[in-house]
UniProtKB/Swiss-Prot annotation:
GO terms of biological process kind: L-tryptophan biosynthetic process
Enzyme class: lyase
EC number: 4.1.1.48
Protein's organism: Koribacter versatilis (strain Ellin345)
This protein's name: Indole-3-glycerol phosphate synthase
Name of the gene this protein is made from: trpC
Length: 260
């Protein structure tokens, strides 16, 4: 595990310890029961049958790039990207490293009809009910950050709340772990966790090793329709795109160009 990822996970655990409580979880349970999740995996699969399924990511900043978008109006961006054809949204909720928030997730979820992914470092079941309470329809589980037992337990907890799980891998060994655990929505992150270098060839190197039932998602480093076409030729069904959209003067115009 890279030192950067370890530092982020340590911060996440400290934050969880500071705000986790039985009363807070009970309140989230109540709020979670008020909403019916929108099918995240189904939305991606259906859009992929008709065109290009893009998960548009609302990301203000990152540890490697610093501030990405200064004019970060979550409601306006969510509306704009849905209207431009996004199949789903990914909303960063990590505060210290990505300048995200659960409130941003809630605002986006209440604004759009497409499903929303909570993009964060999920380590504890308490974060899952919290995600549902704030309107998430899916969560991200990062194989590099979790043991196989953690992955199973957190996936089961997500299912309890009707949430889909995007299982994120970075290399061949992590893909095998995800496949052996039976995940059916697997994303390959093209960002090297040690160097932070991004290379979409990472998604192509082991494309043939996916389990047959898994819907494939390519994440990071996608900047053009040519990138998408190459990945589609390798049987990728969906594409998580953040920085290209967030740096654009017109995210909607950029998304339309990518979708074609």
């Amino acid at each position: 595990m890279s030192s950067t990822l370890q530092a982020i996970l340590d911060d996440t655990r400290r934050d969880l310890a500071a705000r986790k409580s039985a009363a807070r979880t009970k309140e989230f349970e109540k709020r979670a029961a008020e909403h019916t999740p929108r099918g995240f995996r189904t939305a991606l699969w259906e859009r992929a049958q008709a065109g290009v399924a893009v998960i548009a990511e609302l990301k203000k900043a990152s540890p490697s790039k610093g501030l990405i978008r200064a004019n970060f109006d979550v409601i306006a961006l969510a509306k704009e990207l849905e209207e431009a054809g996004a199949a789903a949204l990914s909303v960063l909720t990590d505060v210290p490293h990505f300048q995200g928030s659960l409130e941003n997730l809630e605002r986006a979820s209440q604004t759009v009809r497409i499903p929303c992914l909570r993009k964060d470092f999920i380590l504890d079941p308490a974060q899952i009910v919290e995600a549902r309470a704030y309107g998430a329809d899916a969560i991200l589980l990062i194989v590099a950050a979790l043991t196989d037992l953690d992955l199973r337990n957190l996936r089961d907890e997500a299912k309890r709340y009707g949430l889909d799980v995007l299982c994120e891998v970075h290399d061949r060994d992590e893909l095998k772990r995800a496949a052996d655990l039976g995940f059916d929505l697997i994303g390959v992150n093209n960002r090297n966790l040690k160097t932070f270098r991004v290379d979409i060839e990472n998604s192509l190197r082991f494309a043939e090793e996916f389990p047959p039932n898994a819907l494939r998602v390519a994440e990071s480093g996608i900047h053009s329709r040519e990138d998408i076409d190459r990945l589609r030729d390798a049987a990728y069904s969906a594409f998580l795109i953040g920085e290209s959209l967030m740096r654009a003067d017109s995210p909607s115009a950029t998304l339309r160009e990518l979708i074609g």
